[in-house]
Swiss-Prot record:
This protein's name: UPF0301 protein Csal_0058
Record HAMAP family: UPF0301 (MF_00758)
GO annotations of cellular component type: cytosol
Family: Belongs to the UPF0301 (AlgH) family.
Name of one Pfam family that matches: DUF179
Superkingdom: Bacteria
NCBIfam families named in the record: PRK00228.1-1
Length: 185
């Protein structure tokens, strides 16, 4: 099995599940036990400032208080997942996804962000997307998703609403021109 860790999942136009319709998901882990990732193109109305306030963290030093928190997926919707650049991981609970991309789930990173000492580039998500062993592979066979290798510049330099089309551009396609009907060969 080829791992899809550090890949994007692009929802095909015919995917009508409201949790994933029109989404770009960044896969953080994929092995024989299952798959885990976060949706990176669904900003919520909740801002980082409001989230930090809910957690009783003073965000006075946080330079990106107005940054939106993202809907990361339908699993563990009450947990924070922070996707960020970096290979030096001083945080309590981090997973190195690629050379320069990691996922952290520990409160110490949110405290550092609130104090203006967090990573320069990051996306805060509430919830994640997860698939049981073999489930994503079945969905791929059903043409539910397209996959392409992940790209840090799309994650951290492209506006959230443009990330899906930017990832599709790597493949040379425009999802708006694709049929809503799934094809199988």
């Amino acid at each position: 099995m080829q791992s899809l860790k550090h890949h994007f999942l692009l929802a095909m136009p015919h995917l009508d599940d409201p949790n994933f319709k029109g989404t770009l998901t960044y896969l953080c882990d994929h092995d024989e036990n299952g798959t885990m990732g976060v949706i990176v193109n669904r900003p919520m109305e909740l801002t980082l400032d409001a989230l930090l306030e809910q957690l009783e963290l003073d965000a006075a030093e946080c330079p990106c208080r107005e940054m939106p928190v993202h809907y990361g997926g339908p699993v563990h919707k009450d947990r924070g997942f922070i996707l960020h650049r970096g290979s030096s991981l001083p945080w309590d609970s981090s997973l190195q996804v690629a050379d320069d991309i990691a996922l952290t789930t520990s409160m110490d990173m949110l405290k550092a962000i609130a104090n203006g000492q967090g990573p320069e580039d990051f996306i805060v998500c509430l919830g994640c997307a997860a698939w049981q062993a073999g489930q994503l592979e079945d969905e791929l066979k059903q043409n539910t998703w397209l996959t392409v290798e992940g790209d840090a510049s799309i994650l951290f330099e492209v506006h959230a609403e443009q990330r899906l089309s930017a990832a599709a551009g790597i493949l040379g396609i425009d999802l708006n021109l694709m049929s809503r009907e799934a094809g199988h060969s």
